[in-house]
Amino acid sequence: GQGLAGLGRTHVLHGVVGHQALTAQPAIEAAPAGQHQGDATPAAPASPVAPDLPPPPASPEPQAKPQPAERQGWMARLKAGLRKTGSSITNVFTGTKIDDALYEELEDALLMADTGVKATEALLHDLKRRVKEAKATDPAAVKALLAGGLADLLQPLEKSIVIGAHQPTVIMVAGVNGAGKTTSIGKLTKYLADHDQQVLLAAADTFRAAAREQLGVWATRNTVEIVSQEGGDPAAVSFDAVTAGKARGKDVVLVDTAGRLPTQLHLMQELQKIKRVITKADGSAPHEVLLVIDGNTGQNALHQVKAFDEALGLTGLIVTKLDGTAKGGVLAAIAQEKPIPVYFIGVGEQVQDLQTFNAREFAQALLG
């Protein structure tokens, strides 16, 4: 893939123009800032390609919409990951006629998948209109129409993270313990480093030694610098990291914050303090405030999105652990009730199992 630094205009890597743009790599947009090569980090990795990296896009097999090989592999993993959610919904369409019973079964299946009452009602209302317009007569056709409706509902969530409008771009990451926050930051670091971005990590999760160590491992693996302080003040660590990022000409500063529940008011206030202190270090920062949510938690994830957004003003989401859950419908609930962009979704432990979110791909993988 081509790097981001030095691009003179906003650019989506490996993007395909149009609604069904499929990106082989994470879609990271380089903003118009153009030239922003910082100081080189010491000790460049001996081998630029780590063993757990997916192979570069190979020649795609002939098909209507050529997809890079890596994205084909991703689609297969996404489909497998969403099978639990998808099968309960697609089973509704195995009958021979379209009647009230079909719609009732579909309503139950969508609610069981944690789609939520509002999104379920909206999808069913839209589906009945589509069925009428298309004069559809068999359930298989209805399933295809539902996939179209779901893709349209999810469309507002599809957005690329923009890097390069500010130097450094400061990304603050929050999430409850167990959501996969630190791992997601590690994977994001790998993506950014692979796209020639100079990254600095801030271990502001100072309470959990394991979190600092985990982040340290990712820093070593990706040959990026890390600002860490045992038992230090999280806000102070964040301030130091942003200041260091500016001084060292970094492209991105990623701030890992302590995992917490939205009900822990004093901890939420601490997050707000970290955000304020980041702004003191850089008046325009943080440029992104991301929340990592566990897809397995279903409707609970939606409550987290609402609570963290109220406290911090979220700019994007990373939805992890969508593999093996029966609650993949939660993305539709988020789209209906709190449409904050989903920058990445995860369906596994591997680095390549975190990819950019594409509404149509997701709908097809779920209902295919």
Listing of model-derived features with the role each one plays in the protein:
Residues G1-G149:
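Non-catalytic terminal/linker segments enriched in charged/polar, low-complexity residues
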Residues K118-E121, A147-G368:
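P-loop/Walker A NTP-binding module and the surrounding RecA-like catalytic core of P-loop NTPases
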